[in-house]
Amino acid sequence: GNNPLKTLSPRFSLAYHINQKIDLTASIGTYYKIPTYTTLGYKDANDDLVNKSMKYIQSTHYVLGTQFLPNEGFRITTEGFYKEYNNYPVSASTGVSLANQGTNFGSIGSEEINSTGKGETYGFEIFVQQKLIKKIFYVVSYTFVRSKFSGDNGILIPSSWDNKHLISATLGCKFKKSFEIGLKYRFAGGSPYTPYD
């Protein structure tokens, strides 16, 4: 809407420098995101925009982390996080959250929607970075994450992107004359599914 007080987004962060090699960090913040244009632009048989009164999706993030710098070119960070979602879009016809409708290439949100869903995401991340040393650099990260959203029934169930395990690795080598070659690897755990007999 046009009232900025309804989407006021306070954010706070702290960093505590234990010594030259170790930092502790903490942050909390509220964020708002406009629903997708597919949802906002949906019209019924009378050519009326049925979702024009949807609320912004609200999320509040809580993060605690550490940073370890054993030497100038090497860094390890760890982070634990929890995110809480409100006003998440839910299908008016099925009562299912849009976050639980699959990750295929179909059009999601082109229907009447309510802003009644809730959700949560939580987990931790470990990030390791080696800056350029003897022509070689690398970055490796591992994230464990759980993602759950509710529809009209209020029961949190795994979302379509509840992959649990995410791994990313980049290895690079720099040569003379600004030439560089690299390899990248990504892994995402399987999507949730309902078993059947």
For the regions a language model picked out, list residue spans one by one:
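Hydrophobic, lipid-facing positions within transmembrane beta-strands of outer-membrane proteins
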Residues: 8-14, 50, 60-64, 76, ...
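Gram-negative outer-membrane beta-barrel transporters
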Residues: 82-84, 105-195
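Membrane-spanning beta-strands of outer-membrane beta-barrel proteins
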Residues: 5-8, 47, 57-60, 71, ...
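Residue-level signature of outer-membrane beta-barrel architecture
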Residues: 6, 16-17, 30, 56, ...
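Membrane-spanning beta-strand positions in outer-membrane beta-barrel proteins
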Residues: 13, 17, 23-27, 75-79, ...
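Surface-exposed extracellular loop regions of Gram-negative outer-membrane beta-barrel proteins
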Residues: 20-62, 82-111, 184-197
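Outer-membrane beta-barrel proteins
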Residues: 2-5, 51-56, 115-117, 157-160
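Signature of Gram-negative outer-membrane beta-barrel scaffolds
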Residues: 1-19, 34, 153
